[in-house]
């Protein structure tokens, strides 16, 4: 076989013309120590705080400690295959999560990856998990209500769009139930809801997701889940990721968003674990010195934006679990001081059958009053005062039986008011129905009913109004206040219904 130089030359020329020089530069470091979700890396002298690092096996980490001769990083995912001597690359990016409409109705992990088996999330939009809170000039006062559908909250501890309202109480007092009820009540209100589950059992979160699906609430809800079985870094990042997903709708689409963080006690514990493993100096209750900043930078991102930024809002409902009702512990006092009020749940009330178990005396809303509709203000002002007097008299009445008529009447009305504030789980109530029920209670229309029949009266009276007098409910819904004409109609409706209800009860 003869060698043809011209053919060889043409092949070589062709190869040279098609040759593309690709130089990939990467800053690489070496793992010197790894364990418990923490890695120490030597050689990444130019790494930034919060930067994303690439570990072998397509696992990422986040730089938290910048030290003299190494960096400390938390590993965002499984870390058992990472070993000493492995190479780690800088990415030059900070931690980002996917955002956008495609996430609505999905269950994702703290990195925004789907875990509900419904396929990949189709979005090309990303936002960094850490972003600065809007400044004072970019905000406007809270003035629009966010109805929870719970009589005790909407009347006495009202929440406005853009507010931060803490839900605090012992374990098993109904904290998650209040948050889930609030999400269900946003149906048809054009509010995007984000439920962030931090450090909970996977079975518990699955139950919440199922409940939301049954109520049709997953159509406007994103669930971000970092369960108890996941590494501490995932629990640490989860609430920031959820907040970022909400901020997209607030800033880009000018919509109202509700973000539930359930719960921040476990979030603080995860951060304490990371900080101690990174050898940061411990402070009170072994939490690091910046644990206040951990929660303040998250909750300050909740805001009601002014019209120049589109007027969207992000409302935060953080949850805190107390030990034996101790609200003066470190994390509870921190979060109470950051938020605009708190809903305090008591186990004694819960076990006594008062559900939701809200302690009205210790619960407060610092800005939500401005967001209440006028009709609710008209009935709720008296309600809080009457309940405060009832609690005082009830404590006093334990010591003596000789009570005058006026005191007995106050106690009787107080009992009926406490009864009317009870509400079944997953049964949120429209605000106009709350107003008519509370109007009947504060104006003494229930005083002559046996306490055991108060709930039945409420149920039947609302059915009567819906079927026989829908104009009363429609009037409150449209006017948002009780004018003289509406009050007359409402009084007449109560009296008409009460006659038939009392007669039915006696028969």
Swiss-Prot record:
Protein residues bound to ATP: 169-176
E.C. code: 7.1.2.2
A single GO cellular-component term on record: proton-transporting ATP synthase complex
Residues annotated as site: Required for activity: 363
Subcellular location: Cell membrane
Its membrane topology: Peripheral membrane protein
SUPFAM superfamilies (UniProt xref): C-terminal domain of alpha and beta subunits of F1 ATP synthase (SSF47917), N-terminal domain of alpha and beta subunits of F1 ATP synthase (SSF50615), P-loop containing nucleoside triphosphate hydrolases (SSF52540)
Source organism, top-level taxon: Bacteria
Leader sequence segment: none
Enzyme class: translocase
Principal location listed in the UniProt entry: membrane
GO molecular function, one term: proton-transporting ATP synthase activity, rotational mechanism
Known catalytic reactions: ATP + H2O + 4 H(+)(in) = ADP + phosphate + 5 H(+)(out)
Keywords: ATP synthesis, ATP-binding, Cell membrane, CF(1), Hydrogen ion transport, Ion transport, Membrane, Nucleotide-binding, Translocase, Transport
Family per similarity comment: Belongs to the ATPase alpha/beta chains family.
Role: Produces ATP from ADP in the presence of a proton gradient across the membrane. The alpha chain is a regulatory subunit.
Quaternary organization: F-type ATPases have 2 components, CF(1) - the catalytic core - and CF(0) - the membrane proton channel. CF(1) has five subunits: alpha(3), beta(3), gamma(1), delta(1), epsilon(1). CF(0) has three main subunits: a(1), b(2) and c(9-12). The alpha and beta chains form an alternating ring which encloses part of the gamma chain. CF(1) is attached to CF(0) by a central stalk formed by the gamma and epsilon chains, while a peripheral stalk is formed by the delta and b chains.
HAMAP family (alphabetical): ATP_synth_alpha_bact
PANTHER family documented for this protein: ATP SYNTHASE SUBUNIT ALPHA, MITOCHONDRIAL
Name this protein carries in UniProt: ATP synthase subunit alpha
Organism: Moorella thermoacetica (strain ATCC 39073 / JCM 9320)
Gene (name only): atpA
């Amino acid at each position: 076989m003869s060698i043809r130089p011209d053919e060889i030359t043409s092949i070589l020329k062709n190869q040279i013309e098609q040759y593309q020089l690709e130089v990939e530069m990467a800053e690489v470091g070496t793992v010197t120590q790894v364990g418990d979700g923490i890695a120490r890396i030597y050689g990444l002298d130019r790494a930034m705080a919060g930067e994303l690092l690439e570990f072998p096996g397509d696992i990422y980490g986040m730089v938290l400690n910048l030290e003299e001769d190494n960096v400390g990083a938390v590993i965002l995912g499984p870390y058992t295959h990472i070993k000493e001597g492995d190479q780690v690359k800088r990415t030059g990016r900070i931690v980002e999560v996917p955002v956008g409409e495609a996430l609505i109705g999905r269950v994702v992990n703290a990195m925004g990856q789907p875990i509900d088996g419904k396929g990949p999330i189709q979005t090309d939009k990303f936002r960094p998990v850490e972003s600065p809170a809007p400044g004072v000039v970019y905000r406007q006062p809270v003035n629009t209500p966010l109805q929870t559908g719970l009589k005790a909250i909407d009347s006495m501890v009202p929440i406005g769009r853009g507010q931060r309202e803490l839900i605090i109480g012992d374990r098993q007092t109904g904290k998650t139930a209040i948050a889930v009820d609030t999400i269900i009540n946003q149906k048809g209100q054009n509010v995007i809801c984000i439920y962030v589950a931090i450090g909970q059992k996977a079975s518990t979160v699955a139950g919440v997701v199922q409940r939301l699906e049954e109520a049709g609430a997953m159509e406007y809800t994103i669930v971000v889940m970092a369960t108890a079985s996941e590494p501490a870094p995932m629990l640490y990042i989860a609430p920031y990721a959820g907040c970022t997903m909400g901020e997209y709708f607030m800033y880009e689409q000018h919509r109202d968003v509700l973000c539930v963080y359930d719960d921040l006690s476990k979030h603080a514990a995860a951060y304490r674990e990371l900080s101690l493993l990174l050898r940061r100096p411990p402070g009170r209750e072994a939490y690091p010195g910046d644990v206040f900043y951990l929660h303040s930078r998250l909750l300050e991102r909740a805001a009601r934006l002014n019209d120049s930024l589109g007027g969207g809002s992000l409302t935060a409902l953080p949850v805190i679990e107390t030990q034996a009702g101790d609200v003066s512990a470190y994390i509870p006092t921190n979060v109470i001081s950051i938020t605009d009020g708190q809903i305090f749940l008591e186990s004694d009330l819960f076990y006594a059958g008062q559900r939701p178990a809200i302690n009205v005396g210790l619960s407060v809303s610092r800005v939500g009053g401005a967001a209440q509709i006028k009709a609710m203000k008209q009935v709720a002002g008296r309600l809080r005062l009457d309940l405060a007097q009832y609690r005082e008299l009830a404590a006093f009445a334990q010591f003596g039986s000789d009570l005058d008529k006026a005191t007995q009447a106050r106690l009787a009305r107080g009992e009926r008011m406490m009864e009317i504030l009870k509400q079944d789980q997953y049964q949120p109530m429209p605000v106009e129905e709350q107003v008519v029920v509370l109007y009947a209670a504060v104006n003494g229309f229930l005083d002559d009913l046996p306490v055991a029949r108060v709930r039945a009266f409420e149920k039947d009276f609302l059915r009567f109004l819906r079927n026989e007098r829908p104009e009363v409910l429609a009037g409150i819904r449209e006017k948002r206040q009780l004018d003289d004409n509406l009050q007359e109609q409402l009084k007449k409706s109560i009296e008409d219904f009460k006659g038939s209800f009392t007669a039915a009860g006696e028969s």
